[in-house]
Amino acid sequence: MSEAGEEQPMETTGATENGHEAVPEASRGRGWTGAAAGAGGATAAPPSGNQNGAEGDQINASKNEEDAGKMFVGGLSWDTSKKDLKDYFTKFGEVVDCTIKMDPNTGRSRGFGFILFKDAASVEKVLDQKEHRLDGRVIDPKKAMAMKKDPVKKIFVGGLNPESPTEEKIREYFGEFGEIEAIELPMDPKLNKRRGFVFITFKEEEPVKKVLEKKFHTVSGSKCEIKVAQPKEVYQQQQYGSGGRGNRNRGNRGSGGGGGGGGQSQSWNQGYGNYWNQGYGYQQGYGPGYGGYDYSPYGYYGYGPGYDYSQGSTNYGKSQRRGGHQNNYKPY
């Protein structure tokens, strides 16, 4: 078990004005949020409450439930194993389950995991300790708390011809799915023209589910792509959870380069990317798995298999960083 002295990166994406980010339906539902941290070192016994199942089963089964004995542990070395993690925390109390989240593509640790104590008092003991070190790294344990998400009623529609369809045509098409509360048609302030995307808010959540049954829709001859829209703050957190997966094979939209986008023209990509930098955006890919978790100090929102600490930048308009650990891990 080798030491990993380098920090594993976290980075926030830029979004400022009136912003909503468009994300896939998978992110909706319940989440989790993390609270303050603590320290230690130890040796362990097998998890007594998990003898009939694989490690992590109890944690996974209760992912949408409050559990006073559950902790999130961030900042782990890629070399730290589940046994190492369990051995360390056993000195604070009986550990009934333990898991480290792995990237299914690389088989490598994503640098964070979960501990489930039999007794909630063990969590307080962990938090009472000021610093925790494991495998040469300062780690950051936090309480795991369930957090219910608001119903999603707003969608992003990208790939539209800015000249058409008209607002009336957009309302006519999407009104078939349910009652529309509002339609936003963002403008290019320099050209004083519409951009190639809109936001639609329905009065209920059900129409959003219906619209998302198809990824692409054709409105007045324009093939458009549909995503769930949500506030930029949530989107920024979500970026680190489902990770670089959203951009992994995409170009730098903000600079008008590359990127798929379902056949949209480069000029649309360019305009869309510029507007994203003002507070709008959307992410294509999504790790399934643990969508809906929100460890907000770390931004592990919706941590799906695509997350990797080495996937530094995840927003369109910035180049990706790949490779090993980097010294800009910023949990707060």
Curated annotation (Swiss-Prot):
GO MF annotation list: mRNA binding; protein-containing complex binding; RNA binding; sequence-specific double-stranded DNA binding
Location(s) in or outside the cell: Nucleus; Cytoplasm
Modified residues (Omega-N-methylarginine): 245, 250, 253, 322
GO cellular component, one term: nucleus
UniProt region (Disordered), positions on chain: 1-66, 235-268, 311-332
SMART domains named among the record's database cross-references: RRM (SM00360)
Modified residues (Asymmetric dimethylarginine): 322
Every RRM domain range: 69-154, 153-233
Covalent link Glycyl lysine isopeptide (Lys-Gly) (interchain with G-Cter in SUMO2), residues: 130, 203
InterPro entries xref list: CARG-binding_factor_N, hnRNPAB_RRM1, Nucleotide-bd_a/b_plait_sf, RBD_domain_sf, RRM_dom
Post-translational modification: Dimethylation at Arg-322 is probably asymmetric.
A Pfam cross-reference name: CBFNT
Ranges that cross the membrane: none
Residues found modified as Phosphoserine: 81, 242
Ranges of Low complexity composition bias in the record: 29-49
Modified residues (Dimethylated arginine): 245, 322
Record-listed N6-acetyllysine modification sites: 215, 318
Start-end of Gly residues biased regions: 253-264
GO process annotations (BP): cellular response to amino acid stimulus; chromosomal 5-methylcytosine DNA demethylation pathway; epithelial to mesenchymal transition; mRNA modification; negative regulation of nuclear-transcribed mRNA catabolic process, nonsense-mediated decay; positive regulation of DNA-templated transcription; regulation of gene expression; regulation of intracellular mRNA localization
Keyword terms, alphabetized: Acetylation, Cytoplasm, Isopeptide bond, Methylation, Nucleus, Phosphoprotein, Repeat, RNA-binding, Ubl conjugation
Tissue: Ubiquitous.
Quaternary structure note: Identified in a IGF2BP1-dependent mRNP granule complex containing untranslated mRNAs. Interacts with APOBEC1.
Function per UniProt: Binds single-stranded RNA. Has a high affinity for G-rich and U-rich regions of hnRNA. Also binds to APOB mRNA transcripts around the RNA editing site.
Official protein name in the record: Heterogeneous nuclear ribonucleoprotein A/B
Organism of this sequence: Homo sapiens
